[in-house]
Swiss-Prot record:
<keyword id="KW-0963">Cytoplasm</keyword>
<dbReference type="GO" id="GO:0044183">
    <property type="term" value="F:protein folding chaperone"/>
</dbReference>
<feature type="binding site">
    <location>
        <position position="249"/>
    </location>
    <ligand>
        <name>ATP</name>
    </ligand>
</feature>
<feature type="binding site">
    <location>
        <position position="108"/>
    </location>
    <ligand>
        <name>ATP</name>
    </ligand>
</feature>
<feature type="binding site">
    <location>
        <position position="247"/>
    </location>
    <ligand>
        <name>ATP</name>
    </ligand>
</feature>
<dbReference type="GO" id="GO:0005737">
    <property type="term" value="C:cytoplasm"/>
</dbReference>
<comment type="function">
    <text>ATP-dependent protein-folding chaperone for the eIF2 complex. Binds to the gamma subunit of the eIF2 complex which allows the subunit to assemble with the alpha and beta subunits.</text>
</comment>
<keyword id="KW-0479">Metal-binding</keyword>
<feature type="binding site">
    <location>
        <position position="194"/>
    </location>
    <ligand>
        <name>ATP</name>
    </ligand>
</feature>
<feature type="binding site">
    <location>
        <position position="110"/>
    </location>
    <ligand>
        <name>ATP</name>
    </ligand>
</feature>
<feature type="binding site">
    <location>
        <position position="249"/>
    </location>
    <ligand>
        <name>Mg(2+)</name>
    </ligand>
</feature>
<feature type="binding site">
    <location>
        <position position="169"/>
    </location>
    <ligand>
        <name>ATP</name>
    </ligand>
</feature>
<dbReference type="InterPro" id="IPR009772">
    <property type="entry name" value="CDC123"/>
</dbReference>
<keyword id="KW-0547">Nucleotide-binding</keyword>
<feature type="region of interest" description="Disordered">
    <location>
        <begin position="49"/>
        <end position="68"/>
    </location>
</feature>
<feature type="binding site">
    <location>
        <position position="170"/>
    </location>
    <ligand>
        <name>ATP</name>
    </ligand>
</feature>
<protein>
    <recommendedName>
        <fullName>Translation initiation factor eIF2 assembly protein</fullName>
    </recommendedName>
</protein>
C-alpha cells in the first residue's frame, strides 16, 4: 500500500467524482486550533455549544443552590472548554442545510468506535458539541490525525494533509444492507457483509441478486474512474435493490478485511465464497462471504477499544470533577432537546 493510495481515499478527493451516487455531504476545512483541541489529552470537556441563553439560565434558577460552586474551593481549578465561535457558526449552518441531523467524519474515518458515549448510542449529531464528544472519544479519529500513513510501504516523505470535517446528511441505514467490496487491478474480486458480527437471513437468501446488483453498480459507475486500480469501497443496497456508494478505503492492512484475510485478497489464492454459497456464486464473479448462521456470530470489534482513562476515573470515583463536567454536558443537551420539543421543532 502506497501513501498516494491513502491520499486518494480522502473524502474530498473522491466525493466530487461520485457525488451523484452517494449521500449528500458538505466538507468544511478544520482550523488548526480545532485540531489541537481534538488532540488534547486533557479532561474531556466539550466545546462547540453557544446555547447558554437567558431562558436556559432562568429555567435553572431553581436549582442554582444545588450546583457545585467551583469558586468556593481555592484548591479546585475550573476546567473550561475552548470556544470556536466562527467554526461553530459554519458547522451549524451546514448541519441546517443538510436537514438538521448529520453523520460526521474526518478525511478518512468516522468515530464508529465512540458511539457508546452518545446519549442515544448513535453517531447522529445536531451540533458541533456532539461532534466533538464523539471525535475526542474515538481512536479512529486519533489515527486519522496522527498516523494516516501507517502500514504504507514507501519511504517517501508524508504528504501534507489538510484536515476536513465531513458532514453527511443523516440516513437510516440498515446494517444488513451494507457491504464491503475489494477491488484489485480494477476488478471486483470479493464482497463481504459489512456487519459480519451478525447473521442476516436475507443476505444468504439473496446472495446472487446482491452480488449481481453490486457488480453492475461497480461496472457502471466506479470501474476505471477511481484514481487507483486497487481499493476498497463500501456500498449500501436498499430495499428496492438500488446500490449507493458509502466510502472508499485503501487496499491494505489499514482497512478491515472482515471475513477475508489480506493474504487471500493480495495473493488471490483460496479466494472463494463460503462453502454454503459456492453453488450460487457468479461465474467469474467476485467471491461473496457472509455470516451464514447464528453459530458464527462474533462480538463487535469496536468493543475492543478501551474506555478513555477519564471515564474509567468516573466509574471508580477517582475524579469527581470530571463526572460533574460530563453530567453538566448531558444535562445541557437534554434541556436543549426539551426546549426544541416545546417549540414544536422536529428533526428533518
Amino acid at each position: 500500500m502506497k501513501k498516494e493510495q491513502v491520499v486518494n481515499c480522502q473524502f474530498s478527493v473522491w466525493y466530487p467524482l461520485f457525488k451523484k451516487h452517494t449521500i449528500k455531504s458538505l466538507i468544511l476545512p478544520i482550523p488548526q486550533n480545532v485540531i489541537d483541541y481534538l488532540l488534547d489529552d486533557g479532561t474531556l470537556v466539550v466545546s462547540g455549544s453557544e446555547n447558554n441563553n437567558s431562558q436556559t439560565q432562568a429555567n435553572n434558577s431553581d436549582s442554582d443552590e444545588e450546583d457545585i460552586q467551583w469558586t468556593d474551593d481555592e484548591t479546585t481549578t475550573t476546567v473550561t472548554a475552548p470556544e470556536f465561535p466562527e467554526f461553530n457558526v459554519k458547522v451549524q449552518e451546514a448541519i441546517n442545510v443538510l436537514g438538521g441531523c448529520i453523520f460526521p467524519k474526518l478525511n478518512w474515518s468516522a468515530p464508529r468506535d465512540a458511539n457508546w458515549i452518545a446519549l442515544n448510542s448513535s453517531l447522529q449529531c445536531q451540533s458541533l458539541s456532539e461532534i466533538f464528544l464523539l471525535f475526542k472519544s474515538s481512536d479512529f479519529i486519533t489515527h486519522d490525525l496522527t498516523q494516516p500513513f501507517l502500514h504504507c510501504s514507501d519511504d517517501s516523505p508524508d504528504p501534507t494533509i489538510n484536515y476536513e470535517l465531513v458532514l453527511r446528511k443523516w440516513s437510516e441505514l440498515i446494517p444488513g444492507g451494507e457491504f464491503r467490496c475489494f477491488v484489485k487491478e480494477n476488478k471486483l474480486i470479493a464482497i463481504c457483509q459489512r456487519d459480519y458480527t451478525q447473521h442476516y437471513q436475507h443476505i444468504g437468501k439473496q446472495e446472487a441478486s446482491i452480488s449481481t446488483s453490486i457488480l453492475q453498480f461497480f461496472r457502471d459507475n466506479i470501474q476505471y474512474q477511481f484514481p487507483d486500480e486497487d481499493f476498497v469501497l463500501d456500498v449500501y443496497r436498499d430495499s428496492s435493490g438500488r446500490v449507493w456508494l458509502i466510502d472508499f478505503n485503501p487496499f491494505g492492512e489499514v482497512t478491515d478485511s472482515l471475513l477475508f484475510t489480506w493474504e487471500e485478497l493480495t495473493s488471490g489464492k483460496n479466494l472463494t465464497a463460503n462453502q454454503t454459497q459456492e453453488e450460487t456464486a457468479l461465474p467469474d464473479g467476485p467471491a461473496f462471504r457472509c455470516t451464514n448462521s447464528e453459530v458464527t456470530v462474533q462480538p463487535s470489534p469496536c468493543l475492543s477499544y478501551r474506555i478513555p482513562r477519564d471515564f474509567l476515573d468516573l466509574t471508580t470515583g477517582e475524579d469527581a470533577y470530571k463526572l460533574i463536567d460530563f453530567l453538566k454536558l448531558k444535562r445541557g443537551q437534554q434541556e436543549e432537546e426539551e426546549e426544541s420539543n416545546e417549540e414544536g421543532e422536529e428533526p428533518q
